[in-house]
Amino acid sequence: MDFDTITSISTPMGEGAIGIVRLSGPQAIEIGDILYKGKKKLSEVETHTINYGHIIDPETNETVEEVMVSVLRAPKTFTREDIIEINCHGGILTINRILELTMTYGARMAEPGEYTKRAFLNGRIDLSQAEAVMDFIRSKTDRASKVAMNQIEGRLSDLIKKQRQSILEILAQVEVNIDYPEYDDVEDATTDFLLEQSKRIKEEINQLLETGAQGKIMREGLSTVIVGRPNVGKSSMLNNLIQDNKAIVTEVAGTTRDVLEEYVNVRGVPLRLVDTAGIRDTEDIVEKIGVERSRKALSEADLILFVLNNNEPLTEDDQTLFEVIKNEDVIVIINKTDLEQRLDVSELREMIGDMPLIQTSMLKQEGIDELEIQIKDLFFGGEVQNQDMTYVSNSRHISLLKQARQSIQDAIDAAESGIPMDMVQIDLTRTWEILGEIIGESASDELIDQLFSQFCLGK
């Protein structure tokens, strides 16, 4: 596949130790030769080397920057094209000038994700691996990055390819049956083989889908909302869980006016932790906006930490808030146990039923371990699975696997009902195509463009 040469800045904009301008395509090294001056031309150096020299403006012969240039020749590169990477000092002015020079002499500004898209289109990686690159970049915990790396290395791709190959073998057997319908023994053998292999594939799909809940949490974090009346200790809880003073803590009710969000690793479980403004009726315009945002965060939560004040009886506001969240996954927390107990625990237990109940003192940092263990128990049965497992963490993959499972079940049902093999063949072919969408073998151009548009510029 022929492409033009693209260029972009591959490091974050702003001041820094280094900045990198990356070029990929058939003219990458040629453009480098025009701009670079060193002991040798870039076209003359060995591949996969780093070369010291200077970037020169060809029009003025002015030295623009002192650089180190990496030269990587196709096909042993990320895009399977010639690549050069110009490493210069960090700083907006210089790196932009180098970028402009590369475009002046023949390169085009890359679109978001275009390098990874070329890696996919040139057969370097498949679509699921390409998506995992973005998951890796966005990962917030070691476990999430490991899960993404496993997918980049092709763990999921290998499983999907094996399943598709098995379906092709079934289809080949079905073709024999269709071509020689007069042989009953061939039909019986085909049906037995089809059912055995199809049920095995369905079970493998089931096993992948069983990792979906954990995988999605690994990828996106468990959306955990801390909720309660003002001044019950929500911000103190956020600070204790992330072990940092990100939220302002005072004795003044309504201090938190907005939704605060942090990522934290709790015993191997990545939490997307959200501290909300206390939910109450208020005339304060700013606080009222915060309360509305809190309600929105509640509607999107995987887990709710409902915080109550040990030093106060249950209030009507507590009961009203509980009515909003009672059908969700909730851990109830009695905070401020270092103060005199005025909360009737038996009354609370009657209200919350068998929901998990933890007692804490955020001031004295008591009960935090019990809370972390309860979170882990609630979502992972007390044990987070091995990060080396093959997880399905992408919503698109989960949806396609569910479709594939239904399609192959349709094939099984049809075969067991004695429906003609040419009809069963339709369901099997559909399953093969759906699985192909996961790795990009049968994905539409529109889907591919949409997926890569979510990448950052320069990747």
UniProtKB/Swiss-Prot annotation:
- Listed binding positions for Mg(2+) are S235, T256
The answer, when asked if Nucleotide-binding is one of the entry's keywords, is yes
Positions bound to K(+)? N231, T250, V252, T255
Report keywords, A-Z. Cytoplasm, GTP-binding, Hydrolase, Magnesium, Metal-binding, Nucleotide-binding, Potassium, tRNA processing
> What is stated as this protein's family in its record?
Belongs to the TRAFAC class TrmE-Era-EngA-EngB-Septin-like GTPase superfamily. TrmE GTPase family.
Q: How does it assemble?
A: Homodimer. Heterotetramer of two MnmE and two MnmG subunits.
Q: What is this protein called?
A: tRNA modification GTPase MnmE
Organism from which the protein derives: Staphylococcus epidermidis (strain ATCC 35984 / DSM 28319 / BCRC 17069 / CCUG 31568 / BM 3577 / RP62A)
Gene name linked to the record = mnmE
